[in-house]
Amino acid sequence: MAGALAAANDSTPNGMPASIPELLAMRRAEPDGEFLVTDNERLTFAEADTASLELADALLASGVGKGSRVGILFPNCAQWLISWLAAARIGALTVPLSTFAPGGELGRLLRHTDVQVVLMGQSIAGRDLVDRIQDALPGLTGGEPVIAAPEAPYLRRIYVWPDCDRSWAAPWPSAESVASLACSAENEVGPADDLVVVTTSGTTAQPKSVVHTHGSLVRHAYILARHRGVSSTDRIYSPMPFFWVGGLTMVVLQALSTGAAVLAQDVFEAGSTLALLERERATFISCWAQASQAMADHPDFAKRDLSSVRGGTMLEALPPDRRPREPDLMPNLLGMTETGGPHTMVEVPDTPLPPELRDSFGIPLPGVVQHRIVDPASGVEA
């Protein structure tokens, strides 16, 4: 595993937030702002802060601490955010797990990332995640206080929200009658501490895992948000799952950095997504080309009022002055899991390119990375 932008003595310039505890402290200035809106949930920043603090206390009481590897397996929902924040704010190394992964692949991820504790939901869009864990770990035995799984030898507890009748599932952690130590633990979390293991999609090879520190990923998301002009008045829709770097950096952490709201669903469906965008007055749409095209081709597209949209990747929803005359004049970017998301971006995002910059991927994102072009054989700079 490779750290993307970590350094032994990480420092954060210009007063930028340097860790998840610092981001949460920033959001307390506007506690009532909406953090997440789904088809059936609303979660404010204050609610996420309170709920994750309680879960953090419970995790500490169970033995989770700095460096403990905590897997997160939920759809894009409030409990994903609460669980991830709870583990991250006390210094645990979070391991977001793919809800796309079938049993065999999920088992490999659990073993490869040395997960010790899993926080998970029962299902996603009607598909049973509990059965998938059982498929992933056929040798899973035991129950409280610990479990044993030969396929994932470090795994000791699996917590299923809100409950589960499997013998190996532990009751969801409760903060009742435990010491309140999370705030003290937060004081021990710094920018150089590991925050998250992000696993690649595995499109061209076996999925690989990348470790990012608090300082590297929080700073990256903060700079991205400022460069794109995201603010607390924005409402960002994206079907990108929170467990991949796009959803984590471009959606979850940008919302925490700015106070913007996240609009999300269990699964993408063009008609219901268009209804969500109109109802919740989305301002940014960040999605893959296939999802954009599916919405543009849907019969409801012409009926929906998307006049609130001011930026993003769905050309058909952009205001006329931000819509390029030709598709290849739409600005693009380059990104990698290893760089925590985009590492290039045009100087004025979400606006058409001039013809002389057709197909440009922009410039190295200021304050994030430096680029060099080298001969791959000799290593000599071009």
Predicted regions located by residue number:
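Conserved pre-ATP/AMP-binding loop-to-beta segment of ANL
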Residues: 151-152, 160, 170, 174-199, ...
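Conserved AMP-binding/adenylate-forming core of the ANL superfamily
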Residues: 16, 34-77, 81-85, 102-107, ...
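A short helix-loop-beta submotif of the ANL/AMP-binding
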Residues: 69, 75-95, 99-103, 112-117, ...
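Structural core segment of the AMP-binding/adenylate-forming
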Residues: 61-62, 92-172, 297-300, 307
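Conserved structural elements of the adenylate-forming
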Residues: 49-54, 178-179, 191, 210-231, ...
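AMP-dependent adenylate-forming
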Residues: 22-44, 162, 166
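Conserved AMP-binding/adenylation subdomain of ANL enzymes
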Residues: 218-235, 242-284, 298
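Gly/Ser/Thr-rich phosphate-binding loop
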Residues: 279-287, 291-358, 363-370, 378-379
